[in-house]
């Protein structure tokens, strides 16, 4: 709701308490244009009201007439009320000291990183760095991440994060399938690999015909596998020398993936030095809270020969237009938005913000600090092992880094009971064994408590920590042959910023280079760069959410699970489906899960042969990439001249593949930014031929409260909580991609059987390492919905549509709007056609994108879904003033193009071809251009008081891919 002006309220007598209480409504903070601005935009469009506009935009046949059924969340809460309600849920969680391990560890997030990265909108509101000139800060941070990983693993090249360790291992499996022995379909997993990793691998392997075998690592060379996965150290703590085994696997024609603990690699010989081909793992213990399972940044590193087969994003070094070093995303032709079903992976959003945190943890501590932490962890583990042996227990593993497995026999239940009394969680290995994993937060007092637990179970007295320390001498529990001797993190960036003053200034210097939502609108089509409100972000840092282990006992996570249940029901209401799973930790994973659910449904009906997926030509690249991963055959459906699905072609393809039709994947509103009038007919055609309808939820920001995929024929959708429901993009992640399904598909929602989590009675296997995926950022979406309430969520959708149509209307005289619905109206985004401009002037869409940087804007989405176009999505959060500033910039750029067309400006020496202009270029002694310095840097008057300077000139993409270099740049190169 929009609030009355206080002057009008003050003139009303008497003032009611209810009228005054509405002044804390969150909606007017979230929705950018006020009532007067909205009316001005409606006047421009020729509509009397927002309701009239919506009636004209959305087909009546799919309109949702009832208010969103949000139950207890129908009425909006103030920011304070919502925080208090969420605090009450958080307080139901119990924060125990968790020594469960299994890939997750408590950690200290350095306060300077917490405040200046995780809590800093300059970092968390940025977009994926596809526009490198305005992304140099986070690109440098991600390059640091890659350098950190390659140094610690001993491999040649690393990507800039994946979703979690289990997903990274599954990606490594498919990578090795592409490069491995052609006659084998076997992937061998050692029996001491993390159980959640094995389950995700099995899920990934099944639809693409990979046979996953498990057994002792020693048997791997005889398995005839194209790839072998080893854990280093193993889940039970063993540290094994795999040199001979790796040689044997290679001799048999296989390749080796090692899931390695990065902290352990500061003291253990890295996998790259003993022959591993690929290394994967999690960087969570580098300063990122456990968060009930995520989000955390995984890594994947490879030998040099496999670099073009890597999944995920890769930061590389190039030069700019002036020959200075610049950073960019390299080898993008591997990615799904270009290669589609032939991509190396369907991963789009990764975990950039968490990768940045982990890299800064390494920068802050440096090699000496990291090694000190590792040695202390190992020392405490060794003291614990010595102590329990004194108490009469046997340890299962004599070599270890941080994890000791204890043979507790008949006293196992007692050990857990006594630990529980001290608010300690231990790993339940079996009825006869207990696991204890030490982390950087473990103190000598914690060690004393652990020993007291085992002493109580043994009926003895715990040895003192000091006595154990003195008696153990300098012994370590690491095999002498595996103690690391090679140097790591030698680059200056890891050896300079160790005081808080230096670290603070380094972080500030990086964030100052970038353009994020804290500076200006980011009008990226299909990306929904809306407000990420501070009140939504606050709970992410609460320890009641951050310090919970994903495998903690259920009685300790009551508040988490209640919050998750409530959020699932909120999303059920928004989508019109029957059930939601929050396990997928990215939109790509939600897509993949949805397609696996469709396959499971068909198989349950004896129709497992259905494997054809119809996908419109306009679809986002993740759609065909996900379908391929799910074992489906992609058949492309044509679009007509208006950008809609070609009904005649759809009917023909559905008829042709009727016996094997599994699904259609459509996006609604379409990727062309239009509400297709015949969406119900599309659904009916597919259903008539036995298929299911997958509605991609990427554009859900145009539907909430107005229509719902579950009500117009959809069977399954994924959502992007990092778009519609306010989780920030973080410069390329984290994201959450819930999968929502109709009632007939609910029993197929993903489980995680390895940890006892069961959602669907016939559920598919796990698609993420943790049962609830990236659980610790779910409070963001919970807060957003709770503070908006039903009517304001609908108002937000309507305003997003209003803002998009206002931009389209005002820019139409200057740039053709490529697609529109009845009355020339668009949905929540519009596509501007720049192809005629290229023909008339030689100016490209890339030139316009770079020139927008000089005006202080991130470019709209380039060349998707149509090459040579810009797709603009303003969202509901931008004010009319900001929309007008963007419109004025685009009109001014059109005038600059017109000068080229008319011969008043040179076709090569003009401000567009040389954009962006850095401060160094503009202030240089020599100015070689025909246009003025003022036109280059200050083309509109508003920049005089608010100027953003790109830190580098135009990046040379071709040079970067020809001369691939993906590690930190020596300081001398910047001279």
Curated annotation (Swiss-Prot):
Report the EC number(s), separated by commas if there are several.
1.4.4.2
Q: How does it assemble?
A: The glycine cleavage system is composed of four proteins: P, T, L and H.
Question: Molecular function (GO) terms listed?
Answer: glycine binding; glycine dehydrogenase (decarboxylating) activity; pyridoxal phosphate binding
What name does UniProt use for this protein?
Glycine dehydrogenase (decarboxylating)
List the InterPro entries: GcvP (IPR003437), GDC-P_C (IPR049316), GDC-P_N (IPR049315), GDC_P (IPR020581), PyrdxlP-dep_Trfase (IPR015424), PyrdxlP-dep_Trfase_major (IPR015421), PyrdxlP-dep_Trfase_small (IPR015422)
Q: Which family does it belong to?
A: Belongs to the GcvP family.
Q: Which UniProt keywords apply?
A: Oxidoreductase, Pyridoxal phosphate
One GO-annotated biological process of the protein:
glycine decarboxylation via glycine cleavage system
Q: Which cofactor does it need?
A: pyridoxal 5'-phosphate
Species whose genome carries this gene? Burkholderia multivorans (strain ATCC 17616 / 249)
Function, as annotated, reads: The glycine cleavage system catalyzes the degradation of glycine. The P protein binds the alpha-amino group of glycine through its pyridoxal phosphate cofactor; CO(2) is released and the remaining methylamine moiety is then transferred to the lipoamide cofactor of the H protein.
